[in-house]
Amino acid sequence: MSALLDLALLGSNPDRIRRLMLAGESAVRSEVASCRDPSTRWPVDGVRFLSADELPAGLTSLPDAPPWLFVRGAIPTGPAVAVVGSRRATRYGLELARRIGRTVGGSGWPVVSGLALGVDAAAHEGCLEVGGTALAVLGSGVDVWYPRSNRRLGERILESGGGIVSEFGPGITPEPWRFPFRNRIISGLASVVIVVEAAVRSGALITAHLAVAQGREVMAVPGDIDRATSVGCNLLIRDGAHPITTLDDLVETIEFWLGPAPARP
């Protein structure tokens, strides 16, 4: 089963996977071995292949660690902070996500998110505005921008010294089932996860629950009890997430967990 999942992550055609299954386990494992050779499989300029032994420490400790990563740009070293939330964020949520991105990035912590519409993009934007370092984790190949409207944002992340990463091979297009896989990498690469607006059933809430399971610290923005995009955050706070009441409180709390904010390069 693990080998078949590897082939799916690497982008093998479903028909080819079925033919390999009929051919037997040795055929499947042989195909996986050949797929893992980036020199023959992914001659894509600017894309690096990290094997399991080369993964960042935050990922190697996960029980469901990715078998590899594809990387464009650089993966920042040191503690990072993830900022996630609704794709359909309110104007308030978007502005706050941007301010949080500015505050975290300006304090020297890399900002990790998913390059999605809404909160993700706003947090990345805020980080870049102050010269911070951003890291985007995609639910597609690292050469496939999703959504396409955020392509320029992704390029700016690379131009500013940040990175784009994915466990899915180059050329793989986004599909709904890929995003929960992506979310565990977002939380795994971060020491603290901040949730800005999240519905009760949302990818951001999945990321927060994964963060708790991974032993990460979780913070959430309290919101209007009658607003759908606030329900997830309010539930997280009820269950023990640290509420964000001011941006000064945000920095002080992160420093309590991670130590003094690093100097921004």
Predicted regions and their residues:
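Glycine-biased, small-residue-rich flexible motifs in mid-sequence functional cores and linkers
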Residues: D45, L50-P265
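Short, small/acidic-rich helices and loops at N termini and domain boundaries
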Residues: M1-E54
